[in-house]
């Protein structure tokens, strides 16, 4: 039995306003909530712990090239399906779906422009496209980036962000390891520097080919760099791995890297290296 009925609500609430999608990001490392504008101002790194979020090739281009002015090249290349590969879906259907949903056309973008007034060629990988895996198109793009650097008499920077070779292309993907490594010798013959920047993650056939062949090997902080993943290694050798194994700091300590560079310092460091090594 209801004894009384409130005539008017005692507490007034405003209608809930939905938060704009993507306005707040959560740091995967420390859990801090970061506003999108704060992230952009800090080059997509956490202001609390320094964690580096994965970013697209275009964000690296904007960071590196003067006035965000650059020219992209070889963007018309598309993946083929030499094996007619099918797992849960056809390989070409998978590629088509990713292109439709994301607008990305491959796991690598090439561009050239000026960094502090000096010409620079950049080939940047994108983990958001099939894990940044290297198939025949990615290998060809990196090879053509080498050719462009030679044509422009400019240094080459390759930014790795990949899980390894693209297994859906079988031996064609593995061939790219030898192809990219061999093409880089042309840069060496022309005495043009090759800078390799490894970001999280740089794994598998990428590490085993061009990523470790830089005249200067650089990494972002705490990037995972290796061939097989730590879990696979641990399960194979039946031993615990050293703390920080396969992280950038561990590799720097053991001589596999030359520099670890915070993203906000990346352009400054690349320009400094160009000044020292470029013709």
UniProtKB/Swiss-Prot annotation:
Q: Which GO terms describe its cellular component?
A: acetyl-CoA carboxylase complex
Look up the record and name the cofactor or cofactors this protein needs. Zn(2+)
Write the Enzyme Commission number(s) for this entry.
2.1.3.15
The transmembrane segments are none
Report the cofactor remark: Binds 1 zinc ion per subunit.
List the molecular function annotations (GO) for this entry: acetyl-CoA carboxylase activity; ATP binding; carboxyl- or carbamoyltransferase activity; zinc ion binding
Q: Where does the protein end up?
A: Cytoplasm
Q: What does the record list as GO biological process?
A: fatty acid biosynthetic process; malonyl-CoA biosynthetic process
Name the catalysed reactions: N(6)-carboxybiotinyl-L-lysyl-[protein] + acetyl-CoA = N(6)-biotinyl-L-lysyl-[protein] + malonyl-CoA
Keywords associated with the record: ATP-binding, Cytoplasm, Fatty acid biosynthesis, Fatty acid metabolism, Lipid biosynthesis, Lipid metabolism, Metal-binding, Nucleotide-binding, Transferase, Zinc, Zinc-finger
Task: Please state every residue range assigned to the domain named CoA carboxyltransferase N-terminal.
Answer: 23-279
Locate the residues binding Zn(2+).
27, 30, 46, 49
Q: How does it assemble?
A: Acetyl-CoA carboxylase is a heterohexamer composed of biotin carboxyl carrier protein (AccB), biotin carboxylase (AccC) and two subunits each of ACCase subunit alpha (AccA) and ACCase subunit beta (AccD).
Regarding protein family, the annotation reads: Belongs to the AccD/PCCB family.
Which named protein is this? Acetyl-coenzyme A carboxylase carboxyl transferase subunit beta
- Annotated organism of origin: Chlorobium phaeobacteroides (strain DSM 266 / SMG 266 / 2430)
The upper taxonomy is: Bacteria, Pseudomonadati, Chlorobiota, Chlorobiia, Chlorobiales
């Amino acid at each position: 039995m209801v004894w009384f009925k409130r005539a008017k609500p005692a507490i007034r609430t405003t209608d809930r306003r939905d938060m704009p999608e993507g306005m707040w990001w959560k740091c995967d490392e420390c859990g801090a909530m970061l506003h999108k504008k704060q992230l952009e101002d800090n080059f997509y790194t956490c202001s609390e712990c320094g964690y580096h979020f994965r970013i697209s090739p275009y964000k690296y281009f904007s960071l590196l090239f003067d006035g965000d002015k650059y020219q992209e090249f070889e963007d018309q290349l598309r993946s083929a399906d030499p094996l007619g590969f099918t797992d849960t879906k056809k390989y070409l259907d998978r590629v088509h779906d990713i292109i439709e949903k994301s607008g990305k056309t491959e796991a690598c973008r090439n561009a050239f422009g000026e960094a502090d007034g000096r010409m620079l060629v950049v080939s940047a990988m994108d983990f958001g496209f099939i894990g940044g895996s290297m198939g025949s198109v990615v290998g060809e793009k990196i090879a053509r980036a080498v050719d462009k650097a030679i044509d422009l008499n400019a240094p080459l920077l390759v930014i790795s962000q990949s899980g390894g070779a693209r297994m859906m292309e079988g031996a064609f993907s593995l061939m790219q390891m030898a192809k990219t490594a061999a093409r880089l010798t042309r840069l060496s013959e022309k005495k043009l520097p090759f800078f390799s920047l490894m970001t999280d993650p740089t794994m598998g056939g990428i590490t085993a080919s061009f990523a470790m062949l830089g005249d200067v090997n650089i990494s972002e902080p705490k990037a995972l760099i290796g061939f097989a993943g730590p879990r696979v290694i641990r399960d194979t050798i039946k031993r615990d791995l050293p703390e920080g194994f396969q992280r950038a700091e561990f590799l720097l300590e053991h001589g596999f890297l030359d520099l670890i560079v915070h993203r906000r310092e990346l352009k400054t460091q690349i320009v400094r290296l160009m000044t020292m090594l470029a013709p």
